[in-house]
Amino acid sequence: MDELLEKLLNDLKKKEPKACSIICIGEDLDIIQCMNEHGCFSGGSYSELSNDCETVNFRGIAYKCFFTKDQVKVNFWQISHLTGGLFNFLVSQALNEHGLDLLWIIMVVAQTLSALVSFPEKLLNILRNMKTILINTEETVRNRFEESQNKKLVALLDKNSTTLDISSGILLNFTVVLKQLKHALGLHTSVDNSQEFILQFLRTTLLSVPTSSIVSISADPTSWNNLNVLMKYNFMFQKFKPRDFHAQTIQSETMFIPPCWDTISKIQSVNHEFNIALFKQTAKNFYDTLDISLLLGLFDKSISMLNCHSSKISDGDIPYKSHQVFLQELQNKYSEIKTYSSNKLNKSSIKSSLWKDLIQ
């Protein structure tokens, strides 16, 4: 390995998270309290909410700030409705404070008929905002590269970040939480039919978002365990690292994830170790997977059919990518990245080809 890249890698390994952010989208403003009551923030790696934590609540936007027992700052944003401008602001805040790799977006959906029917449109709007903001973020980062190309490579590291926030910014941690309400159970079959459609829609849509997940929670305290696991995985608190995460740690009856979770972990690990060298390649590949334009027509059709109580849409109407195909694509990308990073780069190639690839 080139001496400069090796030094960069060693510096990255020494860094520990100093801050992270959670953006919770939904009208359930008590979600943070529920997460705390069910052990997501207490015990183990987390401390309970401090009494002196900062609290702001204004017109559907709530902000709380607290610290883990390891003094990791946690910014918690709760918003009832996400707009493009607000999302841009929150992403900018995360980028400036700790990097996009330590940002976790949670969308909470109550399992009621009205919420489930309006959910697909809200989800697609969020994904559209995510894609737009990420593209703008990439342009900003690329401009920073152009401005800094005469400086040392290590100087590009954000002093408050665990990574360079370049390739890892493409992989936003995104989770949809389906919250089961006691009074909504067993009322009528319309809710059950909508739930079935939503799961089908979610599984298909989130195949295009590599680091996405679906979690179902209820009054049962054990149903919150998966959120706890996800938080450890996303933020890598203490000794919990991606390499320690396996699909077996997930309860299959309460959580559904796109395939190749372990492969995604490997891709993220490589990106963290070779952020600069792999920026352009990974950015291009993962932006391609976040293309949801084909789903927009599906949304209009599916909602119309739900409102008219028509038959469910068929599998053939959904632009679906099989797990096997998705797995093979991810494995191919990982192989390309591994091969790329394994090439022996000398100092001259760093100065010439690397910068040339990054800024073109």
Swiss-Prot record:
Highest rank taxon of the organism: Eukaryota
UniProtKB keywords: Acetylation, Cell cycle, Cytoplasm, Cytoskeleton, Dynein, Meiosis, Microtubule, Motor protein
Gene Ontology biological process terms from the UniProt entry: dynein-driven meiotic oscillatory nuclear movement; microtubule cytoskeleton organization; microtubule-based movement; nuclear migration involved in conjugation with cellular fusion
GO molecular function term, any single one: dynein heavy chain binding
PTM summary: The N-terminal part is acetylated.
InterPro entries: Dynein1_light_intermed_chain
Keyword Heme included in the entry's annotation: no
Assembly, per entry: The dynein complex consists of at least two heavy chains and a number of intermediate and light chains. Interacts with rga3, sec10, sec16, syp1, rvb2, spbc19c7.04c, spbc2f12.05 and spac3a11.10c.
Family statement: Belongs to the dynein light intermediate chain DYN3 family.
Function: Component of the cytoplasmic dynein which acts as a motor for the intracellular retrograde motility of vesicles and organelles along microtubules. Promotes oscillatory nuclear movement and efficient pairing of homologous centromeres during meiotic prophase.
Protein name: Dynein intermediate light chain dil1
Species of the source: Schizosaccharomyces pombe (strain 972 / ATCC 24843)
